[in-house]
């Protein structure tokens, strides 16, 4: 089960201790209905309107600890382009990914979204 959770959330280890899965373990054990309800709350029903580019940008920004310059460098885009994308997400969701609490909500929502996609592919 630990390896499955690790593969869902792209943890890059061939050996995975269940105790070290952290938030991924909580998301994995979350009932589908609760996950779907959380996504609805976070994205205000506009999840389908967000482009994959926007979601990928948020993911990369979070991976880089909310560092605009480093994220822009890794994505090969101008920092103003990154700021524009983050502001576009903020307008659609009301969440400012540059604020810790909002970033936490978005990170959790993206993990839940990934888990729900995995469950759908597995027929769960």
Predicted regions: what they are:
Residues 1-124:
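Cytosolic nucleotide-utilizing catalytic cores of signal-transduction proteins
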């Amino acid at each position: 089960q630990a390896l499955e959770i690790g593969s869902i959330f792209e943890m890059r280890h061939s050996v995975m201790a269940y105790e070290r899965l952290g938030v991924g373990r909580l998301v994995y054990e979350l009932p589908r209905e609760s996950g779907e309800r959380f996504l609805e709350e976070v994205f205000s029903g506009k999840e389908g309107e967000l482009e994959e580019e926007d979601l990928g940008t948020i993911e990369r920004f979070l991976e880089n600890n909310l560092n605009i310059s480093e994220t822009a460098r890794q994505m090969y885009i101008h920092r103003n382009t990154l700021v524009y994308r983050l502001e576009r997400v903020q307008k659609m969701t009301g969440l400012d990914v540059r604020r810790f609490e909002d970033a936490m909500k978005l990170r959790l929502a993206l993990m839940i979204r990934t888990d729900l996609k995995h469950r759908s592919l597995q027929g769960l």
